[in-house]
Amino acid sequence: MLEVFEKLVSSPTAAEQGFYVLITVIESLEYDEFEFYIPTIWAIVFGQPEKFRAEKFVKAFLLLISHFIVKHGSIKLVDSMNSVQANIFSLVVKQLWVPHLKLITGAIELKLVAVASTRIIHFLGECPAILDPANIELWGKMLDGIVTLLSWPEQDRVEEEQEMLYIAENVGNTPTFAHLYNAAKKEEDPLKDIKDPKEVLVASLAGLSSRFPGRYPQIINQYLDPANQAALLQLCNTYNCQII
């Protein structure tokens, strides 16, 4: 599997498909069954910086780490990435996650990424490091991205992208690739028990603010777009949640 993934990610035309192979692994196995390989996987990904200029690559990467979070938890994701390079997770959030959140499309994918992003800001919000000004800004901008994803119509936040599918000839025709890739591309909801990611978001924020009253309204006022502040307030009213 690791060999297939590395070949795909290194391919000039099929790089993002490597993430769909890994999604199958993440969804199928317990963490301790592939934990040993995780640092190598992240090292392979971060060793392809030029690939992150491609929107498809980044979106597939966000889907991968979102699957990771909802199946195995935020702490394991953060710790495993930072074991490869100190504080690289913060760079991932700042340079990749936040700018590309609004580009996620598809009902299942949107719910997955929104819930995973909510769990990340909840995790970060509970960390003492949130008091660092740089982390406060990161948290606020990520929340702004989540609200954009959940409240803006798709046509207002996503530029139309031409759909193109490439299969690397030296990888894509192997039985291993075909099985893993096709399994990952099935339209299966990994969060069947969650009906509304908007409710998940405001409930999480209400929980954080009840533990740390006075902290989050100031961050929201500073870092959320005014339209997103209004949208968040409307969501809080809809679900009867307060951010204090």
Task: Enumerate the predicted regions with their spans.
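Alpha-solenoid helical-repeat scaffold
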Residues: 1-244
